[in-house]
Swiss-Prot record:
Belongs to the UPF0262 family. It comes from the Bacteria. Pfam families: UPF0262. It comes from Cereibacter sphaeroides (strain ATCC 17029 / ATH 2.4.9). The lineage of its organism: Bacteria, Pseudomonadati, Pseudomonadota, Alphaproteobacteria, Rhodobacterales. InterPro entries: UCP032146 (IPR008321). This is UPF0262 protein Rsph17029_2283.
Length: 158
């Protein structure tokens, strides 16, 4: 079954995440483990490893690292992605999330809904960028890309 069965966030930031960021992380992990699609493509003519997979996400030397292991914890792959293509969309996502969290405290539902729609649009853009960057490295569906994008945001800013 080609899916992620365990995910770990290798977060080395000395600054603890805010309550909102921690909540986003926990929800994304829960949702990701409940339902996801993650497969490794054929490479160099060799059959790809079959899931389920254990995934560790980390940022090392300014690059996003996907460390992929079998359920038995044998390494089956690792790849690194440049953070450059994610920087602006992550920044935009965090700015709109801050606006959303503030709006929930003081604005009427109609204005909160408008901000939430903008937040979802930016989140979808981040998922699209991630799917593009994963091309040839891993195959994911859009919902999996959305949840992984949330975790990348937590890593990037947490």
């Amino acid at each position: 079954m080609n899916r992620i069965c365990h995910i770990e966030i290798d977060q080395t930031s000395p600054i603890p995440p805010t309550a909102e960021i921690e909540q986003e992380r926990q929800v994304a992990i829960f949702d990701l483990l409940e339902e996801n699609s993650f497969a490794l493509p054929v490479r160099e003519g060799r059959a790809p490893a079959e899931g389920p997979f254990r995934l560790t996400l980390a940022i090392r030397e300014g690059r996003l690292v996907f460390d992929i292991r079998s359920e038995e914890e044998e390494k089956v792959g690792e790849f690194h992605l440049s953070l450059g293509p994610f920087r602006q969309v992550v920044k935009d996502y965090f700015q709109i999330c801050e606006s959303y969290f503030e709006a929930v405290k003081r604005l009427p539902p109609s204005q909160i809904e408008a901000i939430d729609m903008a937040r979802r649009g930016i989140h979808n853009e981040g998922a699209r960028v991630l799917k593009e960057r994963l091309e040839g490295k891993a195959e994911v569906d859009i919902d999996t890309a959305r949840r992984l994008f949330t975790l990348i945001c937590v890593l990037h800013w947490g």
